[in-house]
A protein has these predicted regions:
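Short, ordered loop/turn segments at secondary-structure junctions
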Residues: 9, 40-43, 73, 117-120, ...
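ADP-ribose/adenylate-binding Rossmann-like module
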Residues: 81-116, 261-322
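Adenosine-phosphate binding glycine-rich loop
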Residues: 111, 116-168, 290, 295-359
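Phosphate/diphosphate ligand-binding glycine-rich loop within oxidoreductases
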Residues: 67-149
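An N-terminal-biased, well-structured beta-alpha scaffold segment characteristic
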Residues: 2-104
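A structured beta-alpha segment of the ubiquitous adenosine-cofactor-binding alpha/beta core
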Residues: 50-64, 222-286, 339
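Glycine-rich phosphate/diphosphate-binding loop of Rossmann-like nucleotide-binding domains
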Residues: 10-41, 153-258
Length: 359
């Protein structure tokens, strides 16, 4: 069987790849009966030369491959009929903007293996970039804090070589005594937690977070039953929340009263209560002034996220009084970082990690 590593063609350019040269060598060693070629790319984080030196043929023609492996959606005009493809199609949730892509896949007799639905026996996703979204999202939040307050300056993550370089930059800054709230329990939240821990920011209990003032920056990581409560007052399990979200209301405002920087790393399920609404954000008791919305659900559970932002222009402001977008420098505006393709800013690490998961 012949495998081809495809060139990423989506715009804006995505430098990630499923297999680094080293990981592709492991693939070849693990499955010696396979043949592997790499489509030439001038944007990939690993150069054509790096793959050639690792022993792989570089080609412009993948028509004789049986299986083609990529990261993001393949443009319709680049799809090759009668092939097996691995990539994120962004069609699983019936996204209307990719309806034509799905139709083309069917018309061209393509077998699609979507990374998003490759799971274990319990239904847990095996492949994804959540960790890297959390890592970069937390970093970008601190970068936004420095820009908003004009107290320190951090380079864009995309201009740094790798994760250690990113952490080195964070450890050059001095933070005020802020309270940082992190929601979630999955890969995204764990990635953000890695950043907070690498900065030696102390983690505190919910009780202390809500009631105690500190003379240093601290953070608290919370899950669904911490920021939601049953309407009838019962305290049950996470499973009950997932199965009966309509039986719950948000209990997030107790955290919003004391939080300075909020990192949204949770998964928001359909029918779940919004964490905070536009009316909540207008309250005198709403203290959050910076949101890194890694989850990036537009006009939904995090009211200040009006739109996704971009790597080129990652932050904007949200005016609680008008519920409108303003410049992030506007007094009293909530600063919002809502980039929806964060792993692209850490392409080398994300690619290395992707290959580990894939094999």
């Amino acid at each position: 069987m012949k495998f081809g590593i495809i060139k990423e063609r989506k715009n804006p350019p995505d430098r990630r790849v499923v297999f680094s040269p080293k990981k592709l060598q492991e693939f070849q060693k693990q499955f010696p009966e396979t043949s592997i070629v790499v489509e030439s790319s001038n944007i990939r984080v690993f150069s054509d030369d790096a793959y050639a030196k690792a022993g792989f043929q570089i080609t412009e023609d993948l028509s004789d491959c049986d299986v083609l492996i990529g990261v993001k959606e393949v443009p319709i005009e680049a799809l090759i009929s009668n092939k097996k493809y691995f990539f994120f199609s962004h069609t699983i949730k019936k996204q209307p903007y990719n309806r034509d892509l799905l139709k083309a896949i069917l018309e061209k007799n393509i077998t699609l293996y979507d990374h998003e639905v490759i799971t274990d026996t319990r239904g847990n996703r095996l492949i994804g970039f959540g960790r890297y979204a959390g890592l970069v999202g937390a970093y970008n939040g601190f970068r936004a804090l420095g820009r908003k307050e004009q107290t320190f300056s951090l380079p864009k993550a995309e201009n740094l070589a790798d994760l250690p370089a990113l952490i080195d930059q964070l450890n050059t800054i001095k933070l005020p005594a802020i309270k940082i709230l992190l929601t979630g329990s999955g890969k995204v939240a764990k990635g953000a937690k890695e950043i907070l821990d690498a900065m030696n920011i102390r983690t505190v209990s919910i009780s202390d977070y809500l009631t105690t003032s500190f003379n240093e920056p601290v953070y608290c990581k919370i899950d669904v039953l911490d920021y939601n409560k049953r309407i009838d007052g019962q305290v049950l399990t996470n499973s009950d929340f997932y199965n009966n979200p309509s039986a719950y209301v948000s209990n997030f405002m107790r955290f919003a009263r004391v939080t300075d920087y909020f990192i949204a790393g949770h998964f928001f399920g359909e029918g779940s209560p919004y964490l905070f609404t536009r009316e909540d954000a207008k309250s005198d008791h709403f203290n959050i002034h910076l949101v890194a919305d890694v989850s990036c659900d537009i006009d939904g559970p995090v009211a200040s996220t009006l739109r996704a932002s971009t790597i080129a222009d990652p932050i904007y402001g949200y005016d609680p009084e008008t519920s409108a977008e303003v410049a992030y420098t506007t007094p009293n505006a909530i600063t919002v970082m809502a980039v929806d393709n964060l792993p692209c800013e850490l392409p080398k690490d994300a690619s290395d990690g992707f290959g580990d998961l894939f094999l």
